[in-house]
């Protein structure tokens, strides 16, 4: 069983779907989102509202964490300035705070938008070069 798991983006589409099953896999689930609330909490879950673009809010979240599921990001194609904080700086802050606090494992969800502009008939493999289809895809490349 995972001792302490940090879930970023807990109020988003993927995070809200995974909260319950993840709560069954760990002793303590620390859920975070930029939203001020995410609804009812599971018995071993605590919620901390935080802005991933602010390192001083992310660093304490990773203290004593065994594993991070990093799903916190803006998932829409928007102008670069709208994605810079949450997707680029936020992801950097998660990885850097994990490094500083010796977190051993991070699970990250990428996107087909990172690989991007290939024909539907091309087989995509781990060695396929990135061709992001926009700033959202570029943010996924950056985090990978």
Regions found by a protein language model. Give the residues of each.
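NAD(P)-cofactor binding segment of oxidoreductase domains
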Residues: 68, 79-106
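NAD(P)H-binding glycine-rich loop region in Rossmannoid oxidoreductase-like domains
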Residues: 50-86
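N-terminal Rossmann NAD(P)H-binding glycine-rich loop of SDR-like oxidoreductase domains
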Residues: 4-25
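Active-site Tyr-X1-5-Lys
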Residues: 134-144
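Conserved glycine-rich Rossmann-like NAD(P)H-binding loop of the short-chain dehydrogenase/reductase
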Residues: 26-38
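Short loop/helix-cap segments at secondary-structure boundaries that form the rim of catalytic
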Residues: 36-44, 60
